[in-house]
């Protein structure tokens, strides 16, 4: 009887370990672009709605009325407009693959000269009382994971079969208390479509910004 019990416990331990190992691997699986390639840090991508046509265009740098700097994160209305390319940087600088559920910086790479001297790294702005929103803006800090840069770290999670959603729930500081929420689309008073913390996430996909980049990424595999 003791032998049978020991075998059952051993089997349970092995099964549990295998299960949790699988869950851990799934939680850290690579984010894939529209070509099915792993997202790479430092490579430029367009962030496009996973819903074509009525889903709108790509994410881009924008400006709020009466505020030239820092810039804000907006979505272009036309699905023919890819927006502004972004690059990703991991909190774990040793990993050059962008993975789901891990902390990343997201930084716009402007295609033209800017008037602002602020950074184009995404950050969660202070609460907007008039709009009742936590908007995603720019002027974040790249790298330096820790309590002083909490607002600059985002996560990418699966959303449906082909899409991904953005989430704010930084884990770069174990002792810090922080917000945890999905990120969705909301219109501001100017009618611009912006990103903000939301109970209703929006699904996105990532497209390489040029054929040259596609060739470089494919050469790594």
From Swiss-Prot:
<protein>
    <recommendedName>
        <fullName>21 kDa seed protein</fullName>
    </recommendedName>
</protein>
<keyword id="KW-0732">Signal</keyword>
<feature type="disulfide bond">
    <location>
        <begin position="69"/>
        <end position="116"/>
    </location>
</feature>
<dbReference type="InterPro" id="IPR011065">
    <property type="entry name" value="Kunitz_inhibitor_STI-like_sf"/>
</dbReference>
<dbReference type="GO" id="GO:0004866">
    <property type="term" value="F:endopeptidase inhibitor activity"/>
</dbReference>
<comment type="similarity">
    <text>Belongs to the protease inhibitor I3 (leguminous Kunitz-type inhibitor) family.</text>
</comment>
<dbReference type="InterPro" id="IPR002160">
    <property type="entry name" value="Prot_inh_Kunz-lg"/>
</dbReference>
<feature type="signal peptide">
    <location>
        <begin position="1"/>
        <end position="26"/>
    </location>
</feature>
<keyword id="KW-1015">Disulfide bond</keyword>
<dbReference type="Pfam" id="PF00197">
    <property type="entry name" value="Kunitz_legume"/>
</dbReference>
């Amino acid at each position: 009887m003791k032998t049978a019990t020991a075998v059952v416990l051993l089997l349970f331990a092995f099964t549990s370990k295998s299960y949790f190992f699988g869950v851990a691997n799934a939680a850290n699986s690579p984010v894939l672009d529209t070509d099915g390639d792993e997202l790479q840090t430092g490579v430029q991508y367009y962030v496009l709605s996973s819903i074509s046509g009525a889903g709108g265009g790509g994410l881009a740098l924008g400006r709020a009325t009466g505020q030239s700097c820092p810039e804000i994160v907006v979505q272009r209305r036309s699905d023919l407009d890819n927006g502004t390319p972004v690059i990703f940087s991991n909190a774990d600088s040793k990993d050059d693959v962008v993975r789901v559920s891990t902390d990343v910086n997201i930084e716009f790479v402007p295609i033209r000269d800017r008037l602002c001297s602020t950074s184009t790294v995404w950050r969660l702005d202070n609460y907007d009382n008039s709009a009742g929103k936590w908007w995603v803006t720019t002027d974040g800090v790249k790298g330096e994971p820790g309590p002083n840069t909490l607002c600059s770290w985002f996560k990418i999670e699966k959303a449906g079969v082909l899409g991904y959603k953005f989430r704010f729930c930084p884990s770069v500081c174990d002792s810090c208390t922080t917000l945890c929420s999905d990120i969705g689309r909301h219109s501001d008073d100017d009618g611009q479509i912006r990103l903000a913390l939301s109970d209703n996430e929006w699904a996105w996909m990532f497209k390489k910004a040029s054929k040259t980049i596609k060739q470089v990424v494919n050469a790594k595999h």
